[in-house]
């Protein structure tokens, strides 16, 4: 059995508005299988034995989080989110208690403990690691008008997923330095790569999807249903004990 070293901090940037969903509330507060997307996400993290703290970065005028039952969990700490993901994560890093942090998208409610176990084991043996899925479709490069310029070799291409796990202090420095220089930081791995760290890919499950568009809601609901059917539900945690 892998030593998972309890005491990790998970960071969940949840300050975005999710405009592509076209909903009246931010996408993380949309209902999915009886709970909000964010509740599913937080419950998956909180139920893992290695995670001792979850920091949620919220929009300054968020009026939805306090209505969630999970908001009362004493392991959850709130910070103010920024205009971009990197600023939200950096605000959370300033108060993170653990030596290692996992950053996970608020709108990825189908994360399993099996993927978390694999990520933790790999990250702690190197500079850090992220979950990913291999590109399986044929990839094309186009010009600005949409004309195909080339077919791209997909052999070494991955879709970056979350969580992404790194040592707390190096990640904080990497984000601070990158932001100070105006670098484009699309995820935590890009900041660490820029700072010279070697980041490992860990192949994750295909059902660890991010809810971005309206059609993703039904797909995420199907994945949750399938995951629950494979493992008996626990009395107070119907979706979180999944491998």
Swiss-Prot record:
Transition state stabilizer (site feature) positions: 20, 27
Catalyses which reaction(s): 2-C-methyl-D-erythritol 4-phosphate + CTP + H(+) = 4-CDP-2-C-methyl-D-erythritol + diphosphate
Pathway participation: Isoprenoid biosynthesis; isopentenyl diphosphate biosynthesis via DXP pathway; isopentenyl diphosphate from 1-deoxy-D-xylulose 5-phosphate: step 2/6
Pfam family, one: IspD
Annotated site residues (Positions MEP for the nucleophilic attack) in this chain: 154, 210
The protein's Enzyme Commission number: 2.7.7.60
Broad enzyme group: transferase
An example molecular function term from Gene Ontology annotations: 2-C-methyl-D-erythritol 4-phosphate cytidylyltransferase activity
One GO process term, biological-process aspect: isopentenyl diphosphate biosynthetic process, methylerythritol 4-phosphate pathway
InterPro entries in the record: IspD (IPR001228), IspD/TarI (IPR034683), IspD/TarI_cytidylyltransf_bact (IPR050088), ISPD_synthase_CS (IPR018294), Nucleotide-diphossugar_trans (IPR029044)
TM regions (residue ranges): none
PROSITE patterns: ISPD
Keywords assigned: Isoprene biosynthesis, Nucleotidyltransferase, Transferase
NCBIfam families linked to this entry: ispD (TIGR00453)
Record function comment: Catalyzes the formation of 4-diphosphocytidyl-2-C-methyl-D-erythritol from CTP and 2-C-methyl-D-erythritol 4-phosphate (MEP).
Similarity comment text for this entry: Belongs to the IspD/TarI cytidylyltransferase family. IspD subfamily.
Entry protein name: 2-C-methyl-D-erythritol 4-phosphate cytidylyltransferase
Organism of origin: Aeromonas hydrophila subsp. hydrophila (strain ATCC 7966 / DSM 30187 / BCRC 13018 / CCUG 14551 / JCM 1027 / KCTC 2358 / NCIMB 9240 / NCTC 8049)
Source species taxonomy: Bacteria, Pseudomonadati, Pseudomonadota, Gammaproteobacteria, Aeromonadales
